[in-house]
Structure formats: structure tokens, C-alpha cells
């Protein structure tokens, strides 16, 4: 049965208009994006199937175009739609973060980092640069791919903080393998970076490790120098 044949109150679009987006399931929200299903499957049926195949909404929305195109009814159009939704969400979170007092709202930082880094397939490091009021100045990508900790890399972070006139910063990186626990290398790098930042009167406030499901704070773990 196509969605047009459903009772009006159960159709995703009508349900959204009547009850709000929060009342819709993941499959119903996704069906609105997909707009149409495939032969023998409504848009909601296709959405449910894809969610089951990928395991979560986040994994589906972050799937590479080649993997997505392997499923009937999906292709570059769906990939670009998903990419746009992800980027809009990331920018909204960035705006909220920039308007907030970062240290009084750590959940906003964690939400932003999870959205920004949680689905990355390679290790990505970022710096959140803050002013004296602990407000966000900028978010800058530091590296993409595994980067060995070295003096030049630390110098680049110090230079970035000085160029942006930051009074403090938070760094974060993801663990694509899924474990949020800091490695010994992560701990040693954080100590060296904190020492380097102190020489230019910039404080390293925290270091976050991000996975798709979890965000770990070095400060909360008692690991900050």
C-alpha cells in the first residue's frame, strides 16, 4: 500500500504538520527526505529497510555514495540530500555553540563534537578557540588521518591560537575504531601541548575524544595536566 492510501493522520508529512517533527519515528522522518519508495516498497518501508541495513540513522546519513548506491532506489541524489542535511545540522550546532558560554554548557560542546566528528571514517583533530569570556571564536581542523605527535604539529597549534588571538582552547579528535578511551599517546600529547600553550599564556582547557556514541573529556577523567 502506498503512503497516499494511508489514513491522513498516519502519513508522515501530515503527521509532522499536526504533531510536530519530534512525533515522527526515524523511518518517518527519513521517508519525508526520500519522498518516494521503490517497486513494492513505500518510502517508509524503504526507510525502515535502510535503517535496518545500516544499523542507525547516523551511519546511514554518513554513508559514502558508492555504498549508498548499492541499494535500489538510492544514488547520488539521496547522497547529496543526506550531505546537505548533515551540513545544515553541523552549522546550526556551530551557531549555537558560538552563541553560548562554552564552559557553562559542556553538553553543547559534546553534541557538536559528536555530530562533527562521530561519523568520520579517519581520525580528525580539531581545535575550539575561545576568548577571555570562554566564548567560541572559531573551530579549526588541525589534521585528517593519523598524525604522529611531534614538535612541529604542536607549534602549528600554538601558532593557530596566537593568530586567532585565543585566550584558551579545547582540542578534540575522534577514534574511528569506536573505543573512546584515551591512549597513552593521547595523554602524553595533551601534556606536551598544555606545556607549550602555557609558554604563550594560552590555556588548554580540555581534550575530548569522540566516537559515534560517546564523548570523553580528559578533564572529567582527571587527565588534564
Curated annotation (Swiss-Prot):
Domain MPN: 102-224
Keyword terms, alphabetized: Hydrolase, Metal-binding, Metalloprotease, Protease, Zinc
UniProt motif JAMM motif: location: 173-186
Biological processes per GO annotation: proteolysis
Molecular-function annotations in GO: metal ion binding; metallopeptidase activity
CDD domains: MPN_DUF2466
Tagged with keyword Zinc: yes
Binding site for Zn(2+): 173, 175, 186
Pfam families in UniProt: RadC, UPF0758_N
SUPFAM superfamilies (alphabetical): JAB1/MPN domain, RuvA domain 2-like
Family recorded in the similarity comment: Belongs to the UPF0758 family.
Protein name per Swiss-Prot or TrEMBL: UPF0758 protein NMCC_1157
